[in-house]
Amino acid sequence: MTWTTPDLCDRYPEVTIAEPPFRHFGGRTVFCGPMVTVRCFEDNSRMRELAATPGDARVLVVDGQGSLKHALLGDQIAANAVANGWAGVLIHGGVRDVEMLASLPLGVLALAACPRRTERRDLGDVDVPVSFAGVPFVPGHWLYADANGVLVSPQPLSLDGASGSI
């Protein structure tokens, strides 16, 4: 690893830091990329569609409005995201199939696990600004995540020499 979020925060004090309710569920704990956003409530239809498209090392940021009644991500959509080159997923909501998620080379951050699958009603909005955890998540802005936390920046940050402070 060539960078950590603490080092990026030291180097770029203007970045925005997400409040820390998120847990790592994926096989990758360090990931970054430009954001694609989804706003949905207990319906992962848009997530399923996006995971089937080329990810190009982007990060899917999902505002599930904090609901933990239904998991928005499980092993099938996550495996599709891996196969299509997504770097990671940040979910303001729940996930399931946690043992399988942990075995996949995908960053997955969410609030908690929930065994109940989503209801598919073909609802949700893509590429709209969303806000949760005290942070505005804007399509095309960059997300950086590791075991220390999540930060966002309007532009990509130079990662060269970002490690090594403190």
UniProtKB/Swiss-Prot annotation:
The keyword Metal-binding applies. InterPro entries: RraA, RraA/RraA-like, RraA/RraA-like_sf. A divalent metal cation binds at residue 97. Keywords: Lyase, Metal-binding. Gene3D superfamilies: Ribonuclease E inhibitor RraA/RraA-like (3.50.30.40). Its cofactor is a divalent metal cation. Its EC number is 4.1.3.17, 4.1.1.112. The keyword Lyase applies. SUPFAM superfamilies: RraA-like. Disulfide bonds: none annotated. Substrate binds at residues 74-77, 96. It catalyses: 4-hydroxy-4-methyl-2-oxoglutarate = 2 pyruvate; oxaloacetate + H(+) = pyruvate + CO2. GO terms for biological process: regulation of RNA metabolic process. One of its GO terms (molecular function) is metal ion binding. It is an enzyme of class 4 (lyase). Divalent metal cation. It comes from the Bacteria. Belongs to the class II aldolase/RraA-like family. Homotrimer. NCBIfam families: NOT-MenG, PRK09372.1, PRK12487.1. Catalyzes the aldol cleavage of 4-hydroxy-4-methyl-2-oxoglutarate (HMG) into 2 molecules of pyruvate. Also contains a secondary oxaloacetate (OAA) decarboxylase activity due to the common pyruvate enolate transition state formed following C-C bond cleavage in the retro-aldol and decarboxylation reactions. This is Putative 4-hydroxy-4-methyl-2-oxoglutarate aldolase. It comes from Xanthomonas oryzae pv. oryzae (strain PXO99A).
